C-alpha cells in the first residue's frame, strides 16, 4: 500500500 498511501495518506491508516 506504499503507492496508494503516497497519494492518499488515509489509505495507510486503513491498511494498518
UniProtKB/Swiss-Prot annotation:
GO terms for molecular function: metal ion binding. It is found in: Secreted, Extracellular space, Apoplast. Keywords: Apoplast, Manganese, Metal-binding, Secreted. It comes from the Eukaryota. GO terms for cellular component: apoplast. Its main location: secreted. Belongs to the germin family. Oligomer (believed to be a pentamer but probably hexamer). May play a role in plant defense. Probably has no oxalate oxidase activity even if the active site is conserved. This is Germin-like protein 3. The lineage of its organism: Eukaryota, Viridiplantae, Streptophyta, Embryophyta, Tracheophyta.
